[in-house]
Amino acid sequence: MKPLAYAFLAGLAAATGFEPIGLWPLTLAAFALLLRLVRTAPGLRSALARGWWFGVGHFVVGLNWIATAFTYQAEMPASLGYLAVVLLSLYLAVYPAAAAGLAWRWGRKDDLRLILVFAAAWIVTEWLRAGLFTGFAWNPIGVAILATPLSWSAPLVGTYGLSGVAALLAGILLLLFLRRWRSAGAAAAGVAAVALAGFLAGGPAPGPAGPSLRIVQPNIGQQDKWREGFQEENMERLRRLSTWGGSEPRLLLWPEAAVTRPLENGLDDPGHIMEMLELRQEVADMLGDKDLLLTGGVTWRSADGRDVTSATNSVFVIDKAGRILSRYDKAHLVPYGEYLPMRPILSSLGLSRLAPGDVDFDPGPGARTLDLPVIGKAGFQLCYEIIFSGEVVDRKNRPAFLFNPSNDAWFGAWGPPQHLAQARLRALEEGLPVLRSTPTGISAVIDADGRLLKSLPWRTAGVIDTRLPAPRPPTPFARLGNILPLLFSLVLV
């Protein structure tokens, strides 16, 4: 049992490399210990078990913020949050187990081959984790080394390839421990070559900054947002933070679900239609003459014009006249958050989805680029859609920036900084600036190199006034997507 306990403890330690702790050297050391445990496993089943227990420890700590989301919905007992974290971790641990098993099966006879196969397997299993069963791409280990120069591998091999680089670094630590100096040197040279190639693949420096923008963070907690009677205070906070006296054209950015009443609906009732039009005018009155607003909101849908049968979680483009110029509908919905799987069964048990309301959201068509007046081409990723590497941009119509409105008020102290780190990696690998607006933090301006230019702290009301950072030319990853990390994994083996 000792190896399994060591594997579990190593998994716990590995999670400390992510935000808000950021002890990435400890993450690499923990992965080195996992590799040693795989190396000494007496058989395939033992290697699989050690990888699985490592994964359980890793995900239980790294995903602890999920439990917080269950405290805001009366129909979902808060205690279910901890159970959800454990059950999700038990499932996600299958992927580290698979990587460990493949490394043992194909690499156990040679230490250098062991780490190469492990790194390749880790790339593939993280990619699979992001896609199977709706996908959950949170915290690939490449995020842990975002603060290091090795993150420049991302424009070439993407986030999953960067995770492979992190696995190679852990393997180098093991080789040094085993005094395999030549093998360690060869692996280190390979890692350096990938990072250098990624840096060169980034292309020329971005051009000058673009139009003015303001990001609004109203500091509205989840416990207040849907509280009865709070709608007027919600709009007043947005008004106070949005108003300005300038005459220059400006892009104004509000968070996900900033407007809590529907900006569009499919109901025929004149009262609902009038209420919707009045709401649009109320929003338009907050804008300057040349402002353009991007705001999160909802659309009601009705099959018969009388009752709401579904909804969309959307970003609306609104001008000073109160016109909705365009809309992006979130495509990658959160199961149990934005829709309830097996609704007839689970609702009969008294359960509901985490987001308020008793109808499910419909998914949109996917990544989409909208051409905004004066501003130019914009891409949209709502909330956790930004975590899916290779899926955030319409490659046939590349935008000049990505807007990532989110409601991270659900996710306690650990979720927001982890979410921000993953948004930074999307900027780096795609060569596009990312703008984030959230109700409680962390709102931010990220340049095309993944650098955090400006941000607002968690649980703070305020604005960010700046200019739109320029994009880089398309990176290799922006052109080819996740073909590149998969090719990288083939090269490793």
Locations of the language-model features?
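Generic alpha-helical structural signal
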Residues: 10, 100, 232-239, 281, ...
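Membrane-embedded alpha-helical bundles of multi-pass enzymes
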Residues: 1-202, 243-244, 412-413, 423-426, ...
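Membrane-interface segments at or immediately adjacent to transmembrane helices
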Residues: 144-150, 191-285, 290
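Short, conserved active-site loops that position catalytic residues or coordinate cofactors/metal ions
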Residues: 18-33, 58-65, 217-219, 249-266, ...
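Short, acidic/polar
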Residues: 45, 49, 237-242, 389-392
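Short glycine/proline-enriched turns and hinge-like loops at secondary-structure junctions
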Residues: 133-136, 207, 305-310
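Flexible, membrane-facing loop/turn or short amphipathic-helix motifs
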Residues: 22, 225, 305-306
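Solvent-exposed soluble domains appended to multi-pass membrane proteins
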Residues: 230, 255-493
